[in-house]
């Protein structure tokens, strides 16, 4: 790929969703504008998923690329125009007759994603077992939840080097090897089935009492009934509660078909969010979303949100950073060797802190320097100095003294308070 094509590709990435309103900040955001290397809006600092950006095609391309060169190629289709794999997302449309006084109207419900099973009744039952606010009905809170989780759980920059910022050829190669490895060893897609269907597919087995499944019948045909008619109890691998007869369960092939989950329990073991579209990563007996599986394997830069494939990086505030990305969250100046203040877990240089985040002294009405001692009470702050923390009436210094606070003012006595009231 020559330089002109690379620049064009980067430009298109930054044009996507440009100007879209922020669903979180509302009118406070001027519209989405992607930061050059952070995965956030330059105007409001929210992620792209928080903005009203239509990403269905882009998300389908991302998931399609994830399934490329895996056993899940049946879930993708390659476009004839450019050969890019697209996720064949299963959309389910249900029609429910609604009785009226004179005629019957049709109420249509569209799910932006549904488990790819032939039995629509099973898929519908699966959806009903999810919390209502997480059911991906088009135009609903659940559809927005799915959109956010696709962005959060399966970041494009965790699988595609072209979505990362200035990787070296060596880092690109290491990333490609890492992606190939997790596709072959950890990636999977859940199956929705009825537990009794799974028993019918293989020979009956009896597990230990402490396992996920136990049988109430004895081995053999002691009571004259065949093994296939034995009553079997199932428990969820996550919550350990029993599965109800007739309820769908989720199986994960990499975990083994002796384990099963309630639909609402098929969650990442780290963030505990529903695994979006049942896409999971399996490691050491636990389910992970893509993001947290990768976090368990590689350090992630707190600045650009990308995995770190370089041997040289820095650690600060219990987080990892590319050397070039340990920057002020407000102005992007590099912070190596500089004084900084953490604001909402983001490093901010001293000038930006004083300008944008510092609390104002109730005494002198100037910003309080981060290195200066202060007195704070009930949301109000003062410089810890005799000329600032003093009685609002008689100007007596109150450092180390009892005081009476009244709406940002402080008094040394009841008398002074009465004089100012």
From Swiss-Prot:
Region (Disordered): 134-164
Single annotated GO MF: zinc ion binding
Residue ranges annotated for the LIM zinc-binding domain, each copy included: 234-297, 299-359, 362-421
Cellular component terms per the entry's GO annotation: cytoplasm; focal adhesion
Cellular localization per UniProt: Cytoplasm; Cell junction, Focal adhesion
Keywords noted in UniProt: Cell junction, Cytoplasm, LIM domain, Metal-binding, Repeat, Zinc
Regions of compositional bias (Basic and acidic residues) in chain numbering: 155-164
GO BP, sorted A to Z: negative regulation of cell population proliferation
Top-level division of the source organism's lineage: Eukaryota
Record-annotated PET domain positions: 92-199
Role played: Scaffold protein that may play a role in cell adhesion, cell spreading and in the reorganization of the actin cytoskeleton. Plays a role in the regulation of cell proliferation. May act as a tumor suppressor.
Family, similarity comment: Belongs to the prickle / espinas / testin family.
Subunit details: Interacts via LIM domain 1 with ZYX. Interacts (via LIM domain 3) with ENAH and VASP. Interacts with ALKBH4, talin, actin, alpha-actinin, GRIP1 and PXN. Interacts (via LIM domain 2) with ACTL7A (via N-terminus). Heterodimer with ACTL7A; the heterodimer interacts with ENAH to form a heterotrimer.
Domain note: The N-terminal and the C-terminal halves of the protein can associate with each other, thereby hindering interactions with ZYX.
Stated name of the protein: Testin
Species this chain originates from: Rhinolophus ferrumequinum
């Amino acid at each position: 790929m020559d330089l002109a094509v690379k620049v064009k590709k980067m430009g298109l990435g930054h044009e996507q969703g440009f100007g879209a309103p922020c669903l979180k900040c509302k009118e406070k955001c001027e519209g989405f504008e992607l930061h050059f290397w952070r995965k956030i809006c330059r105007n409001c600092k929210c992620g792209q998923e928080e903005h009203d950006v239509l990403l269905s095609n882009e998300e389908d391309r991302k998931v399609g690329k994830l399934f490329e060169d895996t056993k899940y190629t049946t879930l993708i289709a390659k476009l004839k125009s450019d050969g890019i794999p697209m996720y064949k997302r299963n959309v389910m449309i249900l029609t429910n007759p609604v009785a009226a006084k004179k005629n019957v109207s049709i109420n249509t419900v569209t799910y932006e994603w549904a488990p790819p099973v032939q039995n629509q009744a099973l898929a519908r039952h699966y959806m009903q077992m999810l919390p209502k606010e997480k059911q991906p009905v088009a135009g609903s809170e659940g559809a927005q939840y799915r959109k956010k989780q696709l962005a959060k759980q399966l970041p494009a920059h965790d699988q595609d080097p072209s979505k990362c910022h200035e990787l070296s050829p060596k880092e690109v190669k290491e990333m490609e090897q890492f992606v190939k490895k997790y596709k072959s060893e950890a990636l999977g897609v859940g199956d929705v089935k009825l537990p009794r269907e799974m028993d019918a597919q293989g020979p009956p087995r009896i597990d230990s009492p402490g396992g996920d499944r136990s049988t109430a019948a004895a081995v053999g045909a002691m009571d004259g009934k065949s093994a296939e008619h034995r009553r079997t109890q199932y428990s969820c691998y996550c919550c350990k509660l029993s599965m109800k007869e007739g309820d769908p369960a989720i199986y994960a092939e990499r975990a083994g078909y002796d384990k099963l989950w309630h639909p609402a329990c098929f969650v990442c073991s780290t963030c505990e969010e529903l695994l979006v579209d049942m896409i999971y990563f399996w490691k050491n007996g636990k389910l992970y979303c893509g993001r947290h599986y990768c976090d368990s394997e590689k350090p992630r830069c707190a600045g650009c949100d990308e995995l770190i494939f370089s041997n040289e990086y820095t650690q600060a505030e219990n987080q990892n950073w590319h050397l070039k990305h340990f920057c002020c969250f407000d102005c992007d100046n590099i912070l190596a060797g500089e004084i900084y203040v953490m604001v909402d877990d983001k490093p901010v240089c001293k000038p930006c802190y004083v300008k944008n985040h510092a609390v104002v002294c109730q005494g002198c009405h100037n910003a309080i320097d981060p290195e200066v001692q202060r007195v704070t009470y009930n949301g109000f702050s003062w410089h810890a100095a005799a000329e600032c923390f003093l009685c609002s009436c008689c100007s007596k210094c109150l450092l180390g003294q009892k005081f009476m606070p009244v709406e940002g003012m402080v008094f040394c006595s009841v008398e002074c308070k009465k004089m100012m009231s």
